[in-house]
Amino acid sequence: MSFRGGNRGSRGGFRGNSRGGFGGRAAPQGPPDSVLEMGAFLHPCEGDIVCRSINTKIPYFNAPIYLENKTQVGKVDEILGPLNEVFFTVKCSDGVKAESFSEGDKFYIAPDKLLPIERFLPKPKVAGPPKPKRKRSGAPGGRGGFGGGRGGARGGSRGGFGGGRGGSRGGFGGSRGGFSGGRGGFSGGSRGGSRGGSRGGFGGSRGGSRGGFGGGRRF
């Protein structure tokens, strides 16, 4: 991740902080009591000075930049590059031309206009206490039990009911079987004895009974 991206994100914060903290339109202050080396001139760019940082700290945005004799030449405008190789640009003050400097010329800054580079590094994550695990035996178990109940109820009741149906149908079938057996017995008896007998000796009786039964049906 380039320092430019990180700085542009923090630039809003720094600009807001520096302008708010230092007043923005406050009366201009005189040169600082002391200055530190901040950067070395690389080349001009669209009227601005491009410098390579030679300080281990990061300058404030809009921080005044001086010569060694504490003459102000401009203010920090942009900060560029990765954290291990920082560059910055200087917006020149009125009457100062970027083309008037040579490569290697040094620029200075007040000590109170610097930030430690640690401010721009990601903070390590602090491991907190482990979160207690929720016991999942309550509700899901209840649902499982309820499901078992449903399974038991459905299986038992339907199974029992099905058995009942099977039993009743079986019984009914038995009854039908018994009835059929009865019919078989009756049929066998009647056909064996009665029917044979009727054909032999009760032929008139059969005709009479059928005639009588037919008469009964007419009523």
Swiss-Prot record:
Q: Where is this region: RGG-box 2?
A: 143-212
In this chain, the stretch annotated as Disordered covers: 1-29, 120-219
Q: What are the alphabetically sorted keywords of the record?
A: Nucleus, Repeat, Ribonucleoprotein, Ribosome biogenesis, RNA-binding, rRNA processing
**Compositionally biased spans, kind Gly residues:** 1-24, 139-219
Q: Cross-referenced InterPro entries, in alphabetical order?
A: Gar1/Naf1_Cbf5-bd_sf (IPR038664), H/ACA_rnp_Gar1/Naf1 (IPR007504), Transl_B-barrel_sf (IPR009000)
Q: Where in the cell is it found?
A: Nucleus, Nucleolus
Q: Which GO biological process annotations does it have?
A: snoRNA guided rRNA pseudouridine synthesis
User: Region RGG-box 1: what ranges?
Assistant: 4-24
Q: What are the GO cellular component annotations? A: box H/ACA snoRNP complex
Q: Which residues form a coiled coil?
A: none
List membrane-spanning regions: none
Provide a Gene Ontology MF annotation, just one. Answer: box H/ACA snoRNA binding
Q: Which family does it belong to?
A: Belongs to the GAR1 family.
Record's subunit section: Component of the small nucleolar ribonucleoprotein particles containing H/ACA-type snoRNAs (H/ACA snoRNPs).
Q: What does this protein do?
A: Non-catalytic component of the H/ACA small nucleolar ribonucleoprotein (H/ACA snoRNP), which catalyzes pseudouridylation of rRNA and is required for ribosome biogenesis. This involves the isomerization of uridine such that the ribose is subsequently attached to C5, instead of the normal N1. Pseudouridine ('psi') residues may serve to stabilize the conformation of rRNAs. The H/ACA snoRNP complex also mediates pseudouridylation of other types of RNAs. The H/ACA snoRNP complex mediates pseudouridylation at position 93 in U2 snRNA.
**PANTHER family per record:** H_ACA RIBONUCLEOPROTEIN COMPLEX SUBUNIT 1, NUCLEOLAR PROTEIN FAMILY A MEMBER 1 SNORNP PROTEIN GAR1
| Name of this chain's protein | H/ACA ribonucleoprotein complex subunit GAR1
Naturally occurring in which organism (per UniProt): Kluyveromyces lactis (strain ATCC 8585 / CBS 2359 / DSM 70799 / NBRC 1267 / NRRL Y-1140 / WM37)
